[in-house]
Amino acid sequence: MRAQGRGRLPRRLLLLLALWVQAARPMGYFELQLSALRNVNGELLSGACCDGDGRTTRAGGCGHDECDTYVRVCLKEYQAKVTPTGPCSYGHGATPVLGGNSFYLPPAGAAGDRARARARAGGDQDPGLVVIPFQFAWPRSFTLIVEAWDWDNDTTPNEELLIERVSHAGMINPEDRWKSLHFSGHVAHLELQIRVRCDENYYSATCNKFCRPRNDFFGHYTCDQYGNKACMDGWMGKECKEAVCKQGCNLLHGGCTVPGECRCSYGWQGRFCDECVPYPGCVHGSCVEPWQCNCETNWGGLLCDKDLNYCGSHHPCTNGGTCINAEPDQYRCTCPDGYSGRNCEKAEHACTSNPCANGGSCHEVPSGFECHCPSGWSGPTCALDIDECASNPCAAGGTCVDQVDGFECICPEQWVGATCQLDANECEGKPCLNAFSCKNLIGGYYCDCIPGWKGINCHINVNDCRGQCQHGGTCKDLVNGYQCVCPRGFGGRHCELERDECASSPCHSGGLCEDLADGFHCHCPQGFSGPLCEVDVDLCEPSPCRNGARCYNLEGDYYCACPDDFGGKNCSVPREPCPGGACRVIDGCGSDAGPGMPGTAASGVCGPHGRCVSQPGGNFSCICDSGFTGTYCHENIDDCLGQPCRNGGTCIDEVDAFRCFCPSGWEGELCDTNPNDCLPDPCHSRGRCYDLVNDFYCACDDGWKGKTCHSREFQCDAYTCSNGGTCYDSGDTFRCACPPGWKGSTCAVAKNSSCLPNPCVNGGTCVGSGASFSCICRDGWEGRTCTHNTNDCNPLPCYNGGICVDGVNWFRCECAPGFAGPDCRINIDECQSSPCAYGATCVDEINGYRCSCPPGRAGPRCQEVIGFGRSCWSRGTPFPHGSSWVEDCNSCRCLDGRRDCSKVWCGWKPCLLAGQPEALSAQCPLGQRCLEKAPGQCLRPPCEAWGECGAEEPPSTPCLPRSGHLDNNCARLTLHFNRDHVPQGTTVGAICSGIRSLPATRAVARDRLLVLLCDRASSGASAVEVAVSFSPARDLPDSSLIQGAAHAIVAAITQRGNSSLLLAVTEVKVETVVTGGSSTGLLVPVLCGAFSVLWLACVVLCVWWTRKRRKERERSRLPREESANNQWAPLNPIRNPIERPGGHKDVLYQCKNFTPPPRRADEALPGPAGHAAVREDEEDEDLGRGEEDSLEAEKFLSHKFTKDPGRSPGRPAHWASGPKVDNRAVRSINEARYAGKE
């Protein structure tokens, strides 16, 4: 391990070194290429000769020992007045010894680069090149000091060895081209070239824009020639990390990681993630929020899978049978005479009427009858004669007429030809009557009938009377409907209700019917009157609607159809785009935040130099920082408008400031200072020096001649005139003829002609330096001559398909329809203007809206009145047609003024005993009060604070808990609880109320009153017994109804639901009666005896096998950890069903939804482990008891469901200590015990 750690250390050091090298990479380079140096006299700046031989030029010139010349370069910040002292803040460099007094090097450019490449290939270094790297934003302005020195084997600078010092303060932009500089000093003439280049992946005029192309998690972009990130297709954002989602994708419920997709959040779906996911398994329902299941019409149940109108959806009854909806997914057929079966599919005595003609014989079959025809006849009743028309030669439904040796086709109107094979356009004759349109078909035509009509020509009124009316009611056919005229004493849509005075709901408009001895009395709601509340008080007389709106009188209310310019209940409020100022204002300075972001996100509309201020109506204005102006604060105020720089200086505009770049010969902040070129004295005491602009003049003494009084013979030499000027000797003086672009006595002053005409466009400023120039571009422009407009639309700032319009240092988003905001991130809420009529709900959509209409209204804006269903009243509260509500433990719904409620006896409601008197009375229904519960009703203490609402007795029934009574109208449920999971303070009454409130309990109590009574079970302290019965109990031929109710309640309990009480249930036992006929005879006893013999044989075989295996293990004497242990657990067996007339049977089921209850670690486990250590005599005794139990079986049907919330399926069992034995002969302790055992 230590060696491995020592191996890791070098790797870590190498990694840190690599990271340091990467971080230390420069942003750019300043390069200087020396081309030539000419020191004609071989002298130093002090006038002495090189190599310190003591001679001076004043004494007559230097000897043949030339200077050993090398160059030092110092780069520092821009100085209006250059000072040679001080640090080289930008960097410094030096060359080796390059030559003697004068030398030439390959110039910069293509030819020079090739020469230097050949030198490097030969192993030589480029001697005249000085490269100074920098790791900061290049400021473009700089000061360059170049010094030529004489090498004298001394590493310390010595001013006495200085040959020449020249300086240049100017501006240069990064580019590949070289910029030439010429210097004529006091002693030497220097020619050099400079340039600035950005390092790889660095761009802009300051080399501080870093851009490295990438296509990974951190970005998806390339780099253009200006270093701008160009997002790849489908990506956007500052770093091109945000994928462009599908247009219209709801960013509140979805997003994307791949361009063009729209990935929905959990619970949402659809193309734009704007559709919620319904509850799993929801069949005929929809949702508004995720995991809902709102049922469609005629569907019910938790998953909307219960067909409430099975007859109307499936039409199961055949042969004219009448279908009646019994309960969800159930129906009953009332068959006509001569038919029977569940669907009236069986015909009875079909051959009695001799249906077979021409001597055919009739045979009855389950579906009716069949005719066996004699030779020469065919058909269902042997009525068809076989002839030439038997092959159906006539097409298109033509009628074949048999003739002698032939046939004739009588074609329908739609067809013509010998065999009716040619089609005719039947729609020309307009055959369709009550139809939307006529469509010509091949071989006929089709009439698109209006609802309520049928037939080929839509001329037959659909007979909607199909036996729906019961109890002798007369059905009256209507167009697309029917009406039942009921006989006296019956009512309802199908005359299915037995009428009393109030059963037919005689009171209209939601009136409450009061049954009286001699009739009834209607208590009308507000807005109605009359004996039957049939008189609707016309609230439209006089009309309350304003501004010309039409008034509609509704049920107890009115509705005003407002014009487009007004709204409100009475159309008295002018409609505004933002009524009451409650509309959401589109903030021009912000955008909607995306998921996980704060409320608003800055849009950046004012750029980096302004602050956005919102204005009314979604507008904005920008408050600019000092030095900026413009609508978007995108324009830098030009501080050079007053031309503050003097003497031809170039003014460079900066942020709220300016800078002057002076021409040669001038310095200072405003270029108003002429530096003294006579310092140090260039005349070397041979004459008097006069200062000029970027030059000097020596008035020589004692016969000395030349520019610096250095010659006795000539005024001119090769270096008298600078920059290529031609020298003319005039005897006592000289004259220089300057080339274009230069002026002055020695051609040392540049005319700045490189900026004439101005090469910089779009407001750029040209800074000349001899024959070269540099452009300083205004914000928003870039390039060598400021020709490229900076792309402010990159990276893409516009969302949802918005188009970005690039300006000069600004951008604008043109949004797609339905979107707004500076970056098109706001989905325009078309509901802000309240386009929907009063009372309707507006739902915003992309580039539109949708109106959700209240009942009785329709139209695009819910402005059309189509009528209302009647409301229902419950306890003084009105409920509109189609609505649902809960009363106590029952669920109710309103069906056109009729209350349809489940019939569950809600029993005694739990209540708190302690508290204020008014609070105690409010817990119980009217007329009841909170009383102390009966003793022994607490399932898990403390329960002293809980009581029960009294004064309501249950219906009289013999089906009581702990009574042992079972019949066709009585079932008994025994619920076993895990007391550790039962909440404290739980009483038997609370459990009973929870079961009564189950949706499944309400569903089985539609036709009869369902009574549930609870008490502590005698089988254990953690068990509750529930007695289930219907009231009244008459007309129950068998126990199927009570069995169905019991099993539905048990199924709901096993699903647990959201009740903490039901989660604590570990086992449910169901007991119902099973009736049998006397026709069984001796079959049951014989079967019981045979089963008993087989069971005893199995027991004997198991005992023998167990002993044999035990002996084998004792002989083998294997170690304990190597012995096999069979972990197979026996299933709960079905006990011997003993069936006899009027008796009962006891059957045991294992509930797969439940798991066995948890047990203590020291408690013996059921199954093999729990019986491993049982002695052999104890096993025999248990077997004997099992036989006795089977003979003492009672007559109750018992279904047992068990579960264990405390053990997970994957947890290993804890086996008890002792020798390991075969487990297959051991009975599970979960085997059923017969109820009622003595």
From Swiss-Prot:
Report if keyword Transcription regulation is assigned.
no
One Gene Ontology molecular-function label: calcium ion binding
Membrane topology, Cytoplasmic segments: 1102-1238
What happens after mutating residue 95 to A? In LGMDR27; uncertain significance
Q: Which residues form the EGF-like domain?
A: 241-274, 275-305, 307-345, 347-383, 385-421, 423-459, 461-496, 498-534, 536-572, 574-634, 636-672, 674-710, 712-748, 751-787, 789-825, 827-863
- Residues the record marks as carrying a glycan: 153, 570, 619, 752, 1058
Q: What is this protein called?
A: Protein jagged-2
Origin species, per record, is Homo sapiens
